């Protein structure tokens, strides 16, 4: 079975927004959570547009610095972008690399820190 089916499912099942971009900052994929979160800016229609359209000049500069750092060494793969106290989450920019470790793009990773208080193994 083709692994891409599994990888896409992992991305789609994640409840955190995932936005994948190529090296030209083109949004190549949004998972369902990202499409919903960024609905105010176009949601799923953002695929194919530039991530830079959504950022101010300072943010654009920081994204470019991240990409330069990623490109400088194959071991440079994650940058802590911000902490959002309202949502109790950290946001990271993560390098995407091919099998030869060549930089191919990046994505924004949201890690929520609020404990899930739901019942374990509750099948509803």
Predicted regions and their residues:
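Low-complexity, intrinsically disordered terminal/linker segments enriched in charged
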Residues: 120-124
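Sensory/regulatory domains in signal-transduction proteins
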Residues: 29, 33, 37-119
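Sensory modules in modular signal-transduction proteins
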Residues: 1-35
